[in-house]
Amino acid sequence: MQTSLKIAVVGSGLVGSLLAIYLKKAGHTVHVYDRSPDIRKINFSGRSINLAMSNRGWKALDGVGVGDAVREIAIPMDKRAIHLVDKLNFQNYGQEGESIYSISRGTLNRKMIDLAENAGAEFYFEQKIWDVTLSDATLHIGESERGEWEERKYDMVFGADGAFSRIRHRMQRQSMFNYSQEFLNMGYKELNIPANADRTHKLDKNSFHIWPRGEYMLIALPNLDGSFTCTLFMPFEGENSFESLTDRKMVEDFFEKNFPDSIEVIPELANDFFKNPTSTLVTMKCFPWTYEDKIALIGDACHAIVPFYGQGMNAGFEDITVLNEMIEKFGDDWKKIFTEYQISRKPNADAIAELSYRNFMEMSTKTADEKFLLQKKIEKVFSDKHPDKWIPLYSRVTFSDRPYAEALAIGDFQNGIMEEVLKLDNIENIWNTPEVENKILELLQK
């Protein structure tokens, strides 16, 4: 147990709530602030890509004994269902029994706040933080930026307030603070596949559904109530874009042509399309993440990524796992804890940002590409035979807790091998033969 401190966590989202549980269990007084109303008392909809919980997320939840409470609201998905225009393909994610888990962001966030309150954390909603004094961890709270502010002093402040973090914004005014953000030229919009009348799912509920169409794509993840949360990813401008779909008929014609099997399961398509906002996708990087032993950024506040590997929440939760490891290692030496935390996490945050961007290219174009599908089949056969020699990149990221940076490096090495293998004569017919197996073994020796 550490010496008890008075700690503020800014942001009551998933990472902020879980961090509050960890800090509370370590013996601290924890106050969680959020500028928004209590999510448990309002309807939550319109801009949520469902979450895909995988190993790193479960490890962090199980680390404070709340994993089973979250498993109750999660649906396992053991495969991709790839909806081509004229056929449906299934592609298993990992080994037998390996799944990612679909969870509604709103449902999970409510659950996490309940769990944090039960652990003893105190929540303060509709509290607007306009500034923080870094040197003495003082929050400045008020109704407006130009009105009167109240000061609340803490021993330490954690910024878990997302990609557009107010705490980070204050740190950016420091000398030698590096910061970059990059928006994709595409956005996303939420749509909904309702449940059948008997509350069953209209599509296979244990699949991550994806309609890959190159520059744009549709995905759907299952919810407990029998519905699916769908997300349409499209460029903002251009021929096939949000800008180009200006009336109901254009939207319906576009879906009829490009996602024909989705039309019958999205009855409110046009209404959803024009009612729900179009949201942006941003990658944000910065460094340092900490200030002395007073301030630390965590989760999206220091490494926002695009959602195409389903790792945003998992990476944020893993920040907490690593922070906790440093707490156990260095006790009350918070300066050392913060330094080691950011040194450990920064290269891995950069790696998952890169992997997420690349996976967008994979999901949107390659899942419909015959050569890519052949590569996946060859990798699967070889990996099943030689699990000690080949763990596919997706499995390294999703079903292990080895560092993201290691997964990126090994994935690049494996990809180089597969490029050579796919050049073999008649590979389409000999892919599942000793010749191909031996070629991979030979290339692994180099």
Swiss-Prot record:
Gene3D superfamilies found in the cross-reference section: FAD/NAD(P)-binding domain
Keywords for the protein's UniProt record, in alphabetical order: FAD, Flavoprotein, Monooxygenase, NADP, Oxidoreductase, Pyridine nucleotide biosynthesis
Record keyword Flavoprotein present: yes
Catalyses which reaction(s): L-kynurenine + NADPH + O2 + H(+) = 3-hydroxy-L-kynurenine + NADP(+) + H2O
Pfam families documented for this protein: FAD_binding_3
Pathway(s) where this gene product acts: Cofactor biosynthesis; NAD(+) biosynthesis; quinolinate from L-kynurenine: step 1/3
Family recorded in the similarity comment: Belongs to the aromatic-ring hydroxylase family. KMO subfamily.
Protein name per the record: Kynurenine 3-monooxygenase
